[in-house]
């Protein structure tokens, strides 16, 4: 079905196509025709962060920034959906055009800039959702006009608002599209921010009588020394999990493409190797008590298996859906199932 719709979507501006695709998924959900888009995979229960995921394949943050399509997206067969990034106050993001497809590379460049309706609007949408069939992650960030020295207050405010509703919360400090945000990954800044948020997490757990896991999403552009420093901080502060990785600002694999000079984060197939290297290094540096979600460049079931072999407990897709459609979800679940049943058949050589 998606193969028929893709030419129409690709004839449109990327951001308009994004909106049309979401409306179409919603329509299919409301009319009971989601099965025409994808077949829900047989469950593959997977534990992580003290939660049990129906299957290990999730939707990465960014597709549904405001939590307006949760039920329709879960119906596609995802084991979990991550919404956001959301900020305390609504903001428009960066000027358009700000999203570009690179079909030759099965890639996307975006510089959206945390465009969203604000955390209060997201909370209202989540409260209306039925949330059947999978778990919900909520990805939080800071407003672009909030200085880094005051970033903790933005993250804390969002955490307080979404804590009663989220199955897990992701702290996004790795988007390349908010000026200065990635500086929060520097060792001392990271330690201050995550220490404060861990205290907030524990206080909210006592207040609400439940512990919601807190994950941290990191960039693929960290060098080995920075990865090791981040791993030390995250292990010291006992975060619940790490998502590796966000998009990249580097362009080595698409250097000759006319759009390579566009500012923003590159995602899709060219990110697979780089993001998986970071994932593998983090797995080697972090205790097994801190599970990892592998994201970046998953365009096939084999790519999902490569993430698992590199140390991921769960995986997320986003740009791959642009090129493969919802069938990618079941393909990834089934590939991971085969690896789980016969681990040697799913092994991959070191990157």
Swiss-Prot record:
Annotated NCBIfam families: PRK05286.1-1 (NF003644), PRK05286.1-2 (NF003645), PRK05286.1-4 (NF003646), PRK05286.2-5 (NF003652), pyrD_sub2 (TIGR01036)
Membrane topology label: Peripheral membrane protein
Active site location: 175
Claim: Membrane is one of the keywords in the record: yes
Binding site for substrate: 65, 110-114, 172, 177, 246-247
Pathway: Pyrimidine metabolism; UMP biosynthesis via de novo pathway; orotate from (S)-dihydroorotate (quinone route): step 1/1
Chief location category: membrane
Transmembrane segments annotated in the record for this chain: none
Necessary cofactors: FMN
Function (record text): Catalyzes the conversion of dihydroorotate to orotate with quinone as electron acceptor.
Organism: Xanthomonas oryzae pv. oryzae (strain PXO99A)
Subunit structure of this chain's protein: Monomer.
Any one annotated GO CC term: cytoplasm
Cofactor, free-text remark: Binds 1 FMN per subunit.
Localization per Swiss-Prot or TrEMBL: Cell membrane
PROSITE patterns referenced in this protein's UniProt entry, alphabetically: DHODEHASE_1 (PS00911), DHODEHASE_2 (PS00912)
Residue sites binding FMN per the record: 61-65, 85, 139, 172, 217, 245, 268, 297, 318-319
GO BP terms: 'de novo' pyrimidine nucleobase biosynthetic process; 'de novo' UMP biosynthetic process
Key words of the record: Cell membrane, Flavoprotein, FMN, Membrane, Oxidoreductase, Pyrimidine biosynthesis
HAMAP family: DHO_dh_type2
Protein family according to the UniProt entry: Belongs to the dihydroorotate dehydrogenase family. Type 2 subfamily.
Protein name (record): Dihydroorotate dehydrogenase (quinone)
Taxonomic path: Bacteria, Pseudomonadati, Pseudomonadota, Gammaproteobacteria, Lysobacterales
Entry-linked InterPro entries: Aldolase_TIM, DHO_dehydrogenase, Dihydroorotate_DH_1_2, Dihydroorotate_DH_2, Dihydroorotate_DH_cat, Dihydroorotate_DH_CS
Record GO terms (molecular function): dihydroorotate dehydrogenase (quinone) activity
Listed EC numbers: 1.3.5.2
């Amino acid at each position: 079905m998606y193969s028929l719709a893709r030419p129409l979507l690709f004839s449109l501006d990327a951001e308009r196509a994004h909106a049309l695709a979401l409306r179409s998924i919603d329509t299919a959900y409301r009319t009971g025709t989601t099965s025409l888009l994808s077949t829900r995979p047989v469950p593959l229960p997977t534990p992580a962060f003290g939660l049990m995921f129906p299957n290990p394949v999730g939707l990465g943050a960014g597709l549904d920034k405001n939590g307006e399509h949760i039920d329709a997206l879960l119906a596609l067969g995802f084991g979990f959906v991550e919404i956001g990034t959301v900020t305390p106050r609504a903001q428009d993001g960066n000027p358009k055009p700000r999203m570009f497809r690179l079909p030759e590379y099965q890639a996307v460049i975006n510089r959206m800039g945390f465009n969203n309706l604000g955390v209060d609007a997201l909370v209202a949408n989540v409260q209306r959702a039925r949330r059947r069939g999978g778990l919900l992650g909520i990805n939080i960030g800071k407003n672009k006009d909030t200085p880094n020295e005051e970033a903790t207050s933005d993250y804390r405010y969002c955490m307080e608002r979404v804590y009663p509703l989220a199955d897990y919360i992701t702290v996004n400090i790795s988007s390349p599209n908010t000026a200065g945000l990635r500086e929060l990954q520097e060792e001392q800044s990271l330690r201050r921010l995550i220490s404060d948020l861990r205290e907030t997490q524990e206080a909210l757990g006592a207040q609400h009588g439940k512990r919601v896991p807190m994950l941290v999403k990191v960039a693929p552009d960290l060098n080995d020394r920075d990865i090791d420093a981040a791993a030390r901080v995250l292990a010291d502060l006992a975060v619940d999990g790490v998502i590796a990785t966000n998009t990249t600002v580097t362009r080595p694999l698409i250097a000759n493409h006319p759009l390579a000079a566009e500012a923003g984060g590159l995602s899709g197939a060219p990110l697979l190797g780089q993001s998986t290297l970071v994932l593998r290094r983090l797995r080697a540096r972090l205790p097994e008590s801190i599970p990892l979600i592998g994201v970046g460049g998953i365009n096939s079931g084999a790519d999902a298996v490569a993430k698992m072999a590199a140390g991921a407990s769960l995986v997320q897709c986003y740009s791959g859906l642009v090129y493969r459609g919802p069938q990618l979800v079941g393909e990834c679940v089934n590939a991971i199932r085969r690896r789980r049943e016969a681990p040697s058949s799913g092994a991959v050589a070191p990157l």
